[in-house]
Design a protein with these regions (language model features):
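Hydrophobic aliphatic residues
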Residues: 43-47, 104, 167, 192
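Flexible beta-alpha connector loops of hexameric P-loop NTPases
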Residues: 83-93, 120, 149-152
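Residue-level signal for inorganic ion chemistry
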Residues: 65, 146, 188
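Canonical P-loop GTPase G-domain recognition
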Residues: 3-16, 150-205
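Helical mechanochemical/support elements of P-loop NTPase systems and associated helical scaffolds
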Residues: 22, 48, 61, 73-76, ...
Length: 217
């Protein structure tokens, strides 16, 4: 599988308003400014598909993209709003939590979450909480280390080992990516291709609230 075409579908503050057509969903999650929009653009080879911003925390909606529409490899890519951005009021934090919980509670087509972390930094408590939530809920996820071009290959193992320890994953289970160089794109495409063929029985709806989502700081 490869991504041949992509288009923006809608932005929404509530997942319940999205009248999907039953396509598999791939969600992209991560801390504000981790590079979600840049990664989506690199995956789709479309520099202006997802809007990037120098202001962390600007994306406050669920953004939906249709990938490979009209083909056997069609799916929806869901860009989840970033977490962990400090400069928001309590009302905004509450809306973020409700939006995210609403998505995970109501999405029947979610196949996998691409959980992004910045390879240069140790995972935050929010990252750890997010991975714990996904793991406890039985939702498949793939940890993706962004901005891999910012560190030397010789020192990469040190950084991935630290991320693996924090998130209870082996370093070789991580995918290192760079939106600048295209590194890791083929691995992610294979991961997505396998995920969209998966059944959805893995999600136990009774477990979705056992672990709390990270708080929007």
């Amino acid at each position: 599988m490869d991504i041949k075409k992509a288009k923006f579908v809608t932005s929404m503050a509530s997942y319940g308003k999205f009248a999907g057509i039953g396509l598999p969903q791939i969600a992209v999650a991560g801390k504000s400014n981790v590079g979600k929009s840049s990664l989506i653009n690199a995956l789709c080879r479309h520099n202006k598909l997802a809007k990037t911003s120098a202001t962390p925390g600007k994306t406050r909606l669920l953004n939906v993209f249709e990938i490979n529409g009209g083909t056997g490899d069609a799916f929806h890519l869901i860009d989840l709003p970033g977490y962990g951005f400090a400069k928001v009021d309590k009302g905004e934090k509450l809306r973020w939590g409700q939006m995210m919980q609403g998505y995970f509670d109501n999405s029947r087509e979610l196949r996998i979450v691409l959980q992004l972390v910045d390879i240069r930094h140790d995972p935050t408590q929010d990252d750890i909480d997010m991975v714990s939530f996904l793991r406890a809920s039985g939702i498949p996820f793939q940890i993706v280390c962004t901005k891999a071009d910012k560190i030397s290959r010789g020192s990469r193992m040190k950084y991935t080992a630290a991320i693996g320890r924090a998130l209870q994953a082996q370093p070789w289970e991580l995918i290192c990516c760079s939106s600048e160089t295209g590194e890791g794109r083929d691995q992610l495409i294979r991961c997505i291709g396998e995920a969209i063929k998966m059944p959805v029985e893995f999600i136990d709806e009774d477990e979705l609230t056992d672990e709390e989502l990270p708080e929007e700081e």
